[in-house]
């Protein structure tokens, strides 16, 4: 690779992507900027209009496709603000025939709407680079009383609790995602010693889970605090 494995870079992700070799990554997961217009403690989530946001994402998505192996997959997490625009971009760049799933993550926590149904889910777009992609079927506990104690194939709606403020897993970074969410993705779309990449690393959950599951990784965030938190969490894996 044109970059080191098992390292977290503090830089513009487009610049890092341009340095990476073709066909060098097995799985990409990115919890992208949702374009909420909010300024969080750790980052500014404002890319302008949805169209301006897509102009910003497009060169990055093109590079992500280039570095992905033919057997690789990409998961992009967003919400209602960008999902429709992002789906069109991904259909154009990764091709409609390589769309696999739109996963709904139902998380439960959050505010309630006064003049709307409460918004309690994120969208995760799952695309492959080709039809020869890695996929390990995942199972979950059956909910029917008749099938109690049995397993069933996982569906595309994932009911996983978000991390509450008192949870041991919470590390104090805005929009931190739960490990269970990343375990499902990484187990399904990679094998041991594969390379996992995250170019919006944030709290570092994706890389921590990758390391716990015996995968190599490469991460990037433009925020130094995100990189520092991620490196600290990675150092604690296995201790």
Where are these regions (language model features)?
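Core catalytic lobe of class I
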Residues: 1-239
């Amino acid at each position: 690779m044109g970059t080191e494995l098992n390292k977290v870079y503090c830089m513009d992700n487009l610049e890092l992507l341009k340095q990476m070799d073709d066909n060098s990554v097995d799985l990409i997961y990115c919890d992208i900027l949702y374009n909420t217009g909010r300024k969080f403690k750790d980052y500014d989530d404002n890319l302008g209009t949805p169209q301006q946001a897509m102009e910003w994402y497009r060169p990055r998505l093109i590079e992500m496709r280039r570095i992905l192996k033919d057997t690789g997959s990409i998961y992009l997490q967003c919400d209602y603000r960008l999902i429709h625009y992002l789906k069109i971009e991904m259909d154009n760049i990764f091709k409609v025939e390589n769309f696999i799933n739109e996963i709904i993550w139902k998380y439960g926590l959050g505010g309630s709407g006064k003049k709307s149904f409460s918004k309690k889910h994120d969208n995760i777009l799952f695309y492959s680079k080709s039809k020869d992609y890695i996929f390990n079927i995942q199972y979950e506990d059956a909910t029917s009383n008749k099938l109690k104690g049995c397993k069933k194939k996982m569906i595309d709606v994932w009911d996983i609790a978000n991390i509450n403020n008192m949870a041991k897993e919470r590390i104090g970074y805005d929009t931190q995602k739960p490990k269970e969410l990343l375990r499902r993705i990484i187990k399904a779309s990679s094998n041991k010693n594969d390379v996992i990449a995250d170019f919006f690393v944030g709290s570092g959950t994706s890389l921590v889970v990758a390391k716990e599951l015996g995968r190599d990784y490469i991460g990037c965030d433009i925020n130094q605090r995100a990189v520092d938190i991620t490196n600290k969490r990675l150092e604690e894996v296995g201790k």
